[in-house]
Regions:
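Short alpha-helices
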Residues: 106-171
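General beta-strand structural signal in soluble alpha/beta enzymes
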Residues: 19, 51-53, 102-103, 140-142
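Hydrophobic helix-and-loop "lid/oligomerization" segment in the mid-to-C-terminal part
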Residues: 2-23, 27, 31-57, 70-76, ...
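Active-site cofactor/cluster-binding pocket
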Residues: 61-115
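Short, hinge-like loop/turn segments at secondary-structure boundaries
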Residues: 66-70, 118-121, 268-269
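A generic local secondary-structure boundary/capping motif
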Residues: 69, 90-92, 116-119, 137-139, ...
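Glycine-rich, phosphate-binding/catalytic loops in enzymes
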Residues: 35-37, 95-98, 118-119, 170
Length: 314
């Protein structure tokens, strides 16, 4: 029996299923979480299937969370989607259910859960949920197809990143054949507000780039207040430095309210997630996140990125 069949058996065995995802969600986190919820609701209308977590204001157009009570976890199956390690799981009640399943595509550095399905070759967790439906012959409702397509598009950078495979395109084509409003979804995913556009201009104006293509920019709390932006809204400009031809690796340091920095790191070709692991983070080889607790640590992270950029140059 493969892992997908094992997961389906567990789903069939429980009356209540609660689905989690990571903090500071992106389209793949919400797409896989709520896409799975809607898939299971369509297949098992007699079951209670709930999605929990903080409603990210910039993504409520994609989906909103359910109200989940403490007592809902009694005897429940809990599934965590798109979350590499336990500190990043949104809503710590995930520990209070009866059985825990992890479904993810990040490196499996934290093998939590009673049953795990981790495929690091997958472009996204949304791709895995769509594959789950396909392989087990489960009919996807329109709402789930829309969510899973959004998750795939989000995590592949519109099919730009290296994890985009033949299977990714095949699954995306299958989802696209289901009649959700593709044009409206694509337009929404490509839209930023004026405040974010101005921040992007600031990033280009203030980006520090060394001779090897390592780049960085720091966004302070004062700057975020000036642009009237939340930390979550800065996610829209993370890819901006990569559009510059001379940039190969980059980091955006975003100061948090408590003074520490959330660090978003990206690379065009060279592996950077080992740097993230050394600084309270992790992620994919070319797209990772870390945490820094001083300006000196910011400098250290940038120096490590510079070293990566220098290594095997070209």
């Amino acid at each position: 029996m493969n892992v997908m069949n094992e997961i389906l058996e567990k789903i069939q065995a429980y009356d209540t299923i609660i689905i989690h995802r990571h903090q500071n969600p992106d389209p793949d986190a919400i797409g896989s979480q709520v896409g799975l919820r809607d898939l299971l609701r369509a297949q098992f209308p007699q079951k209670r299937v709930l999605a929990t977590g903080y409603d990210e204001p910039t993504l409520t157009w994609l989906a909103e969370m359910d109200e989940v009570k403490d007592e809902d976890y009694e005897g429940a199956l809990v599934i965590v989607c798109d979350t590499a390690n336990t500190p990043r799981i949104d809503d710590k009640r995930y520990m209070t259910g009866d059985f825990l399943i992890k479904i993810d595509h990040h490196p499996n550095d934290d093998a939590y859960g009673d049953l795990l399905w981790v495929d690091t070759d997958s472009s996204s967790t949304s791709e895995l949920i769509a594959l789950f439906a396909k392989e087990l012959d489960l009919e996807l409702p329109v709402s789930a197809a829309r969510l899973l397509y959004a998750g795939i598009v989000g995590d592949t950078g519109r099919f730009l990143y290296p994890a985009t495979s033949t299977r990714t395109f095949e699954i995306a084509a299958t989802l696209r054949s289901i009649p959700f409003d593709f044009t409206a979804l694509a337009r929404q995913m490509d839209t930023i507000n004026l405040k974010t556009a101005k921040l992007q201009g600031y990033v280009y104006d203030h980006l520090e780039i060394d001779e090897h293509g390592a780049a960085r920019v720091t966004l302070t709390q004062e700057l975020l207040k000036k642009f009237d932006l939340r930390d979550s809204e800065t996610a829209a400009i993370v890819g901006a430095p990569g559009r510059i031809d001379t940039v190969s690796v980059w980091a955006i340091f975003v100061e948090q309210a408590d003074g520490h920095f959330r660090v978003r790191m990206r690379s065009k070709r060279k592996v950077i997630n080992e740097i993230a692991k050394r600084h309270n983070g992790g992620g994919h080889p070319l797209a990772s996140g870390a945490n820094s607790y001083s300006l000196e640590e910011n400098d250290q992270i940038y120096q490590e990125l510079q070293e990566v950029a220098r290594t095997n140059e070209g």
